[in-house]
């Protein structure tokens, strides 16, 4: 019993010593921290009294650029209608319009957004250099023509001889039920001249349909896009050539891969640069001579091929 009592007192003594030790360490740490704080306060107070602190901070603040404001400030518009975008906004527009254009290719707003979000500066600079290296291209950049039903005078074009470029163009417009007035203004490309170059490409698209005779149905659009990509190099046209056929039926893919892709590759590569064609000045020229001069072969009539296919399909069903 005596041993247990002695052992208990010993444990109490150890506990008390440990408690005192912890209290001592805590007190010492608090004292040291307080000393550092007071020392820092004293040092700052001394600098303030000598007039050193404020001068130093003023110099530092004047020398540090306001990078935060620069990063978050939106650039000013470079031309009427221009909408400057941050890089992450352009990426979001690209992703959203890519999905939209694939799932709903009939919706023009997705096609427009995808086209501008992929019209990267190096591609447009290459087209700019191509135009500046050609006398007609330089004339286009200098005069900045715009294509509308008024500027093209569609009524006059309807009176031209059948084999002229102008008559071929307006007949294609009437047959497909489209108008040059439907082309949307470019607004997301940051440089004013590059924006015009892309606008010019966009407005000339219907001429590429007209001179090749390809309709605005999905197969015709894809074929023209491949032709454009091989000649002009607009990225969206290449994306369309890769992904648009994935949604098509087997018969449509076969026509594209066996007939129209080979034609588009050959004609697009062999043709002179389409971006340098001043269409407004050659509307009364012979279209066959134009195709020959440019190096463009006319593809088989897509609508006739489709009619023949459906006719054979119908006859096969009757036989079965």
Curated annotation (Swiss-Prot):
A biological process from GO: ubiquinone biosynthetic process
Q: What top-level branch of life does the organism fall under?
A: Eukaryota
This protein's cofactor list reads:
Zn(2+)
Write down the EC number: 4.1.1.130
Task: Kindly list the GO CC terms recorded for this protein.
Answer: extrinsic component of mitochondrial inner membrane
EC top class named in words = lyase
Substrates-to-products reaction catalysed: a 4-hydroxy-3-methoxy-5-(all-trans-polyprenyl)benzoate + H(+) = a 2-methoxy-6-(all-trans-polyprenyl)phenol + CO2
- Coarse class of the protein's main subcellular location: mitochondrion
Give one Pfam hit by family name: Coq4
InterPro entries, per the entry: Coq4, Coq4_euk
Question: Can the keyword Transferase be found in this entry's annotation?
Answer: no
Q: Please give the pathway this protein is involved in.
A: Cofactor biosynthesis; ubiquinone biosynthesis
How does this protein lie in the membrane? Peripheral membrane protein
Range annotated as the organelle transit peptide:
1-31
Question: What residues does Zn(2+) bind to?
Answer: 205-206, 209, 221
Question: Which key words are in the record?
Answer: Lyase, Membrane, Metal-binding, Mitochondrion, Mitochondrion inner membrane, Transit peptide, Ubiquinone biosynthesis, Zinc
The cellular location(s) given in this protein's UniProt record come to: Mitochondrion inner membrane
Describe its assembly: Component of a multi-subunit COQ enzyme complex, composed of at least COQ3, COQ4, COQ5, COQ6, COQ7 and COQ9.
Q: Which family does it belong to?
A: Belongs to the COQ4 family.
Q: Tell me, what does this protein do in biology?
A: Lyase that catalyzes the C1-decarboxylation of 4-hydroxy-3-methoxy-5-(all-trans-polyprenyl)benzoic acid into 2-methoxy-6-(all-trans-polyprenyl)phenol during ubiquinone biosynthesis.
Name of the molecule in the record: Ubiquinone biosynthesis protein COQ4, mitochondrial
Q: Which gene encodes it?
A: COQ4
């Amino acid at each position: 019993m005596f041993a247990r009592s002695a052992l208990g007192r010993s444990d109490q003594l150890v506990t008390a010593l440990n408690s005192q030790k912890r209290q001592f360490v805590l007190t010492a740490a608090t004292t040291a921290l307080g000393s550092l704080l007071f020392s820092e306060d004293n040092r700052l107070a001394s600098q303030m009294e000598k007039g050193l602190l404020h001068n130093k901070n003023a110099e530092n603040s004047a020398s540090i650029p306001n990078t935060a404001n620069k990063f978050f400030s939106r650039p000013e518009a470079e031309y009427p209608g221009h909408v400057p975008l941050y890089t992450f906004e352009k990426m979001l527009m690209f992703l959203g319009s890519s999905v939209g254009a694939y799932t709903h290719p009939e919706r023009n707003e997705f096609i427009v957004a995808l086209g501008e979000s992929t019209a990267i500066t190096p591609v447009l600079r290459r087209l700019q250099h191509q135009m500046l290296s050609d006398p007609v291209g330089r004339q286009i950049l200098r005069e900045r023509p715009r294509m509308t039903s008024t500027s093209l005078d569609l009524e006059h074009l309807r009176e031209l001889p059948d084999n002229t470029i102008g008559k071929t163009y307006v007949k294609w417009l009437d047959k497909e039920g489209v108008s040059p007035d439907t082309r949307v203004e470019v607004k997301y490309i940051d440089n004013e001249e590059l924006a015009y170059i892309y606008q010019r490409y966009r407005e000339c698209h219907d001429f590429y349909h007209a001179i090749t005779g390809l309709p605005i149905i999905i197969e015709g659009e894809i074929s023209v896009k491949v032709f454009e990509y091989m000649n002009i190099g607009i990225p969206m046209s290449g994306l369309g050539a890769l992904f648009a056929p994935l949604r098509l039926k087997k018969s449509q893919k076969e026509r594209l891969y066996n007939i129209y892709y080979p034609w588009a590759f050959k004609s697009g590569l062999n043709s002179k640069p389409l971006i340098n064609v001043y269409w407004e000045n050659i509307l009364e020229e012979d279209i066959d001579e134009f195709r020959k001069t440019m190096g463009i072969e006319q593809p088989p009539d897509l609508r006739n091929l489709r009619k023949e296919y459906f006719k054979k399909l119908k006859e096969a069903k009757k036989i079965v």
